[in-house]
Amino acid sequence: MTDPNPQIRPARPHQKLLDDGRTVREVLTYTRRGSRLDAKQQKAWDAYAAEWVIPDEAVDEPGFSLESWFGRKGPLIVDIGGGVGEATAVLAANRPEANILALEVWRPGVAESLARVGAAGATNVRFCSVDALWTLENLVEPVSVSEVWTFFPDPWHKTRHHKRRLVTPTNARMIAERLAPGGIWRLATDWVEYAEQMVEVLDAEPLLSGGVVERWDERPVTKFERKGLAKDRVITDLLYRR
């Protein structure tokens, strides 16, 4: 673990306070959105959340173990920002031997993902809504991950927001360190300039090698991707290996 004492972890995002009690202003890779569920989402939540969703407060408990939430050993795949689970459900069903940790902060998205994963008959996904970078750094052991999936992360296209992008040198190093030898980081984006930055950042990371690749045929075309294609955006797939 990053912290040498597993009983004590850094405060999670939204919990870091100054001495006067004010919340620390943080640079996050996502925006906060509403958490209210509609009737269909609530039904999925009620059906699956108790078994498949890791409560936020659970990660603060001494001795927290990801493996215990899966109830078995298996190759660990981390899905960062899976949205409503269109890709997560299909890929999880195709990888029944893998333990898939789906990191998504938007609660309605988690609820829709639960419905899709359940409909796909996949029982190997556990959802966590704690900040993905904090989770990777503090809950995921180095050299323990077989794959990381980062499909269509927010491009934060305004220059002043580029600091909020997920793929930065600091984040790339931390994620690369979580990959086992031979582990893979798969990415996709419909924003050409972000794809170029991804290549620049990941090519410069000495733990990784790879680049732009043909579209991964196992990755389903999601509603989000179809919208990008309808706007004539170029979809770029990347693969880097440790």
Residue map of PLM features:
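A short glycine-rich, Lys/Arg-flanked "PGG" loop and its adjoining helix->strand segment in the class I
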Residues: V167-P181
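Conserved SAM/SAH-binding beta-strand->alpha-helix loop
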Residues: W106
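Conserved glycine-rich SAM-binding loop
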Residues: G83
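S-adenosyl-L-methionine
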Residues: T2-V78, E86-A93, L114-P142
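Class I S-adenosyl-L-methionine
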Residues: M198-R242
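Conserved beta-strand/loop positions that form the S-adenosyl-L-methionine
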Residues: I80, L103
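Conserved beta-strand signature within the Rossmann-like core of class I S-adenosyl-L-methionine
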Residues: P181-T189
